[in-house]
Structures are given as structure tokens and as C-alpha cells.
Amino acid sequence: MIKLEQICRYVWINGDLIPYQFARIHVLTHSLHYSGSVFEGERAYNGKVFKLKEHTERLIQSAEALGLKVPYSVDEIIKAHEFLITHNNIKDAYIRPLIWCGDESLNITNPALSTNFLIASIPSMPMSCEQGVNLHVSRWRKAMPDSTPVQSKSAAQYNMAITSKKEAKALGYDDALLLDYEGFIAECTTTNIFFVKDTTLYTPIADRFLNGITRKTIIEIAKNLCLEVKEERLKLAQIEYFTGCFVTGTAIEVQNISSIDLGDKKILFEDCKIADLLKKEYLRIVRG
């Protein structure tokens, strides 16, 4: 396995460019103990970050939802990205901006806590799987939207996703399908899900989970290709009537789903034509 120190030269922290091996935080960092950090996952294609403004605006909104004050403007954050990409000399990169609280206090809240900002970039790694992905339905449910800021991309939101994926992997699956608190289909652990029937896409309403930037892009592409898109509450019992299924995300882009195991039966998806068409158009757009 390649270590990050082998592929990441510099990290941008609080306005300074720091060699990877010297980028450190204290063990008593507040966000390390209380999951009080927010982040983004971004992709650069040929040196240009796709939808960087949208990612940056969402990052700031995520921080504000947790009461974190971001000391940089959208334009300053964009320039920091460009600065880091140039110095790391990586054209196709996965980029991780992160905002977190410092180590001034371990109290749950304290006005003395500092807000810190990091941007890291590493070469993009192949994430998609040509033969498709097999899903297991997780026993864990997404939280109610009035119990946590679901549109905030915060570290705390990923605890259940990590647990669900670990359990799915241990059972021999590739990933987990997550349901919301009412038992409707929500998303996968780090991706948004779509189903296909003829020339119509079906996808859960994004009010109970993070509305992905790639998800929104794919919906826009689909409509431009004269495909119908229906956003609605979807039950597990409905999925056997769909012929195709795929997921979307910044890292994975567009990935076909081969099967979803419901426990009493496994639903197979063999129609990849729509997903392949959308992926082809998506890659054309991001690579400009």
C-alpha cells in the first residue's frame, strides 16, 4: 500500500505551505475528540478543480452549521487551492480541505478555541470498478434531519457510514446501502444512488442526507440528454422493478451497481447503458 507521505509533498495549513512530514496537530485537538471538523472531497482534472466554487461554498456552510468561523473568503480559499496544486505539481488530484478546532480547550464549547484550515492534495487513484459493485443493506439508519445538520459535510456524519461499510466488507460485499429513519432508501456510505427504468432515473429526495455536488451534476446532465429524473421516496420493495442502478460521488464519479442483497433475495442490475452514457458525458465535462 502506498503511504500518503510518498505522494503528498506539501500541505497548506492556515496560510502556510508545509512539507507533508511536518504537518502535525496536537493529541488534545478538540475536533479529534469530538468529531468537530468539516471537510470536502474534490477532484482536479488537468490542474483545474471541478466545481471548486460550489465545494468551497458548501464547506463554509458546513462550518457555519457547526458554529465554526472560517477566517478566509471563498476567493482566498480558491487561490489557496491553486497555490497548492501548483507546488505539488499534480494535474489530476484528489483534494481534501478540512476545517477543525484547535487544542486550546477540551470543554465542549469554549470561545478560546481556534479555527484551523488545511488543504491537502494527492494524485487521483482509480476508484470505479468495471464489473460493478455489490451492496448490502445496512442495519444502521440515517439520523432524523432535525437531529443533526444533514447538509453539513462533517466528520460526525461519517461514523455510521464507516461502521456500515466495515460490516458490509466483512460479509463479502463492496459497500452498504443506507436507509433513512423511516426505512426509505437514502444513499450509500459515501455516494448518492440512482435507479434506472427505461429512460427514467429515480433517486431519493436529498433532504435526509447530503445533496452531493456530483449528484446534482448528473441530474443536470440527464435532463440535458432528455432523460426524465424523478426524485421521490423509494422503498426497498420497489427496486426489483428497476433494470439499472448506479452511484455518484466526487471520488468514484459514476459507478454501476451489480446487485443489492435484501437478505431474502438478491436484486441484480444488468442495464448499464444509461449509467455509461452519463459517465461518458460527465468525464467529458470535468476534463473540459
Curated annotation (Swiss-Prot):
Keyword annotations of the record: Amino-acid biosynthesis, Aminotransferase, Branched-chain amino acid biosynthesis, Pyridoxal phosphate, Transferase
Xref: PROSITE patterns: AA_TRANSFER_CLASS_4 (PS00770)
InterPro entries linked: Aminotrans_IV, Aminotrans_IV_CS, Aminotransferase-like, BCAT-like_C, BCAT-like_N, BCAT_family, Class-IV_PLP-Dep_Aminotrnsfr
Known cofactor(s): pyridoxal 5'-phosphate
GO cellular component, one term: cytosol
Catalytic reaction annotation: L-leucine + 2-oxoglutarate = 4-methyl-2-oxopentanoate + L-glutamate; L-isoleucine + 2-oxoglutarate = (S)-3-methyl-2-oxopentanoate + L-glutamate; L-valine + 2-oxoglutarate = 3-methyl-2-oxobutanoate + L-glutamate
EC number: 2.6.1.42
GO MF annotation, one: L-leucine-2-oxoglutarate transaminase activity
GO BP terms, alphabetized: isoleucine biosynthetic process; L-leucine biosynthetic process; L-valine biosynthetic process
Pfam family, one: Aminotran_4
Pathway the protein contributes to: Amino-acid biosynthesis; L-isoleucine biosynthesis; L-isoleucine from 2-oxobutanoate: step 4/4; Amino-acid biosynthesis; L-leucine biosynthesis; L-leucine from 3-methyl-2-oxobutanoate: step 4/4; Amino-acid biosynthesis; L-valine biosynthesis; L-valine from pyruvate: step 4/4
N6-(pyridoxal phosphate)lysine: residues bearing it: 153
Membership in a protein family: Belongs to the class-IV pyridoxal-phosphate-dependent aminotransferase family.
The protein's role, per its UniProt record: Acts on leucine, isoleucine and valine.
Designated name of the protein: Probable branched-chain-amino-acid aminotransferase
